[in-house]
Amino acid sequence: VTRKLDLDPVLVARARELAARAGAPVVELARSHTTVSVERAVLRLAGVQGADPDGIPWVNRLVDAVAADVGLGHGVAVPVFDALAREQLVDVTLLAQKAAAGSVRFEVPAGRAATAARRGARRAVAAGVRRVDRRRAERERLVRRFGDPPQRPWIYLIVATGDIYEDIPQAQAAARAGADAIAVIRSTGQSLLDYVPEGATREGFAGTYATQENFRLMRAALDESSRELGRYVRLTNYASGLCMPEMAALAGLERLDMMLNDSMYGILFRDINPIRTFVDQRFSRQVHARAGIIINTGEDNYLTTADAVDEAHTVTVSQLLNEYFAHEAGLADWQLGLGHAFEINPDVPESLRLELAHALLARELFPDAPLKWMPPTKHMTGDVFRGNLLDGFFNLVGALTGQGILLVGMMTEAVVTPWLSDRDIALQNVRYVLGAAGGLREDFVPASGGFIQQRAHQVLRSAVELLERVGEQSLLTAIGEGTFGIMKRPADRGRGLDGVARHEGDYYNPAVQILEGAGS
């Protein structure tokens, strides 16, 4: 990558060192705690499926039953597989049904029974991880067969009506019109559900519920489109909220390609407890690493509440922290869709030059990451002509700065849920800019010591200063004080805290052992 900003390599190294210092205590916290969703994800990998007549998933019934008898601190794998042996059952879903009926008691076995339970749990979870491995190999095979999109950035488009059977033809039409990645945005508030709904769904609110069956249906439909178009069309969903680990496991089992995955989004904008979501994030990222899924992080959201000029450095800080957390969980650089956005008020003088400085800074700090570039939303007024022009400038900045994933902006943002015709016009805009200026990046070199370079240096310096302060006080304190997105979220508050447990001395999680490389 050509260095265009002349960043100080010592300062860049210092920024990464400070991010690691700020992030390390959070990783230790995540390594010493578990959550109901982590344990449910383990059981999903072990093969538990389905829901009771009220729609409550059997994994929820089983984890709740174990927690009521022995707590969560030992992990659920050993108590569950011990009970399976005592009840002389082979099907974990059947055990969940008996547990829900109150006819099974759980205990923490010792000695030979504990060894046997660990062996059984590991065998079952390893089979689930092998399924994830097969789906990853399948993706790699299909990418070789159909090919990747010929251009970068990939064109990423949101489709979601609430009805998966309506989403499918819309997604296929979007792929034909040029979309490379389809995101099925979730029904409003799903991130606050502490369970994953079951089955195909036909109604949602400003989005479509994320379920394993919906994942399967859409992936199959986009495979058809990939065959038809001669390029592999990627599918995106959301591993955020209270069920991050389960969403990651289901995405791996159903061969999704990208997942939104950032605990900061849940903390700031869904008031989810910080400890809960950092524990969940680490496990979900380990699953994503194994599944070959590209994560997308949510820094763009800060700029919807905070000012995009004044708080630009908080985006850089968050990107550096996300890189540290992702690497620690096993994700490679090519899997880091670090987020940022074109959200500066267009009335600010030189706003386009500022956007170029910020976008180029992200590109140069993370040269091997496929950055996720998000369109203007906050300053879309309902004037669709102005909106289309703004989106054109956004697309141009994406091309000039080598972004990896470009979310298509809608000129009707803040007016209506997009019509098919709105998407078509938006895609025409992207196709024109990438077709006319896709190679302009090689000619675009900011003036040495000029406005763009100076702004990028200033943002990096501010990011380092903020990381120094965060390191002195702790990341959880900084989040509690409203450092990011001007939202104050203390570590002892928020949704989902009651689903967190500290590890006991004999805690056992076969999925983590396998994902961290102690065999498969």
Predicted regions and their residues:
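Short amphipathic alpha-helices and their capping/turn segments at secondary-structure boundaries
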Residues: 167-180, 248-249, 280-287, 395-396
